[in-house]
Swiss-Prot record:
<keyword id="KW-0540">Nuclease</keyword>
<protein>
    <recommendedName>
        <fullName>Ribonuclease P protein component</fullName>
        <ecNumber>3.1.26.5</ecNumber>
    </recommendedName>
</protein>
<dbReference type="GO" id="GO:0030677">
    <property type="term" value="C:ribonuclease P complex"/>
</dbReference>
<dbReference type="GO" id="GO:0001682">
    <property type="term" value="P:tRNA 5'-leader removal"/>
</dbReference>
<keyword id="KW-0694">RNA-binding</keyword>
<dbReference type="InterPro" id="IPR014721">
    <property type="entry name" value="Ribsml_uS5_D2-typ_fold_subgr"/>
</dbReference>
<comment type="similarity">
    <text>Belongs to the RnpA family.</text>
</comment>
<keyword id="KW-0378">Hydrolase</keyword>
<dbReference type="GO" id="GO:0042781">
    <property type="term" value="F:3'-tRNA processing endoribonuclease activity"/>
</dbReference>
<dbReference type="Pfam" id="PF00825">
    <property type="entry name" value="Ribonuclease_P"/>
</dbReference>
<dbReference type="InterPro" id="IPR020568">
    <property type="entry name" value="Ribosomal_Su5_D2-typ_SF"/>
</dbReference>
<keyword id="KW-0819">tRNA processing</keyword>
<comment type="subunit">
    <text>Consists of a catalytic RNA component (M1 or rnpB) and a protein subunit.</text>
</comment>
<dbReference type="InterPro" id="IPR000100">
    <property type="entry name" value="RNase_P"/>
</dbReference>
<keyword id="KW-0255">Endonuclease</keyword>
<dbReference type="GO" id="GO:0004526">
    <property type="term" value="F:ribonuclease P activity"/>
</dbReference>
<dbReference type="InterPro" id="IPR020539">
    <property type="entry name" value="RNase_P_CS"/>
</dbReference>
Length: 134
């Protein structure tokens, strides 16, 4: 089980980490006013990066509120997102959503992103089986 905290190891910190996700995303989840891009990170925990510019959300107070809401939603849903680097890109209109609407929208987006990932169990070769009588 993944710890529920949101420490430094759960964040994308450097431009190189963001660039890796932008250059070759292996998963996408577009929403009405947001885009989630994801890429495998080969770690046992997910990492989150936020891109919320002034063009998308004018007021700093609103940008900070949105970032808090997204981080909290990520923290609560990270068990389903293990092994991914995720970048959230804001679009116009994101600042108009209330906290409840944000939480609901991101709950759906995390689930959509988790479903879009190929199963990790699919790495087992088809000729192998745990059944000795097969």
């Amino acid at each position: 089980m993944v710890s529920r905290g949101f420490g430094r190891e759960k964040r994308l910190l450097t431009p190189r980490q963001f660039k890796a996700v932008f250059d070759s995303p292996s998963g996408k989840a577009p929403g009405k006013s947001v885009l989630l891009l994801a890429r495998d990170n080969q770690l046992d925990h997910p990492r989150l990066g936020l891109v919320i510019g002034k063009k998308s959300v004018k007021l700093a107070v609103e940008r900070n509120r949105i970032k808090r809401q997204i981080r909290e939603s990520f923290r609560l849903n990270q068990d389903n997102l293990v092994g991914w680097d995720i970048v959230v890109v804001a679009r116009k209109g994101l600042g108009d959503l209330e906290n409840g609407e944000l939480a609901q929208q991101f709950g759906k987006l995390w689930k959509r992103l988790a479903r879009s990932r190929p199963s990790r169990d699919a790495d087992v070769s088809p000729g192998t089986s745990d059944n000795p009588h097969a």
